[in-house]
């Protein structure tokens, strides 16, 4: 058994929607990113890579590589999981937290869990996503960006 953790942060910028956990959420702003800016899946990728001692998302999908410009993070997640499976690992469970003052995540969490479970070829009960705010404190509280944290157990 091996544990991995991941963290990602993206600032808000131009746009009218965000992608979190593979779910498109209408919002008054977008997220600044080289790919689709899915902070939750980026944190999850880092957690998986870390658990398998495979580095981090920046090593595998550098933001200097135009091949990953506007990349779908669900595709990146599936690629990461393929690397783990090639080393003989499989997911036991994943627990993730989204830190955002806005938009509200609760209406979208069940869809996020389903998409992540599909991408990791696991039962939805092995995937947990929760959301919290910072009670208007810090950059998340000022609605300047979104943070995501992920912890995984692999075997």
Swiss-Prot record:
It is an enzyme of class 4 (lyase). It holds the Pfam family YgbB. One of its GO terms (biological process) is terpenoid biosynthetic process. Keywords: Isoprene biosynthesis, Lyase, Metal-binding. Binds 1 divalent metal cation per subunit. Transmembrane segments: none annotated. Its EC number is 4.6.1.12. Homotrimer. This is 2-C-methyl-D-erythritol 2,4-cyclodiphosphate synthase. It comes from Saccharophagus degradans (strain 2-40 / ATCC 43961 / DSM 17024).
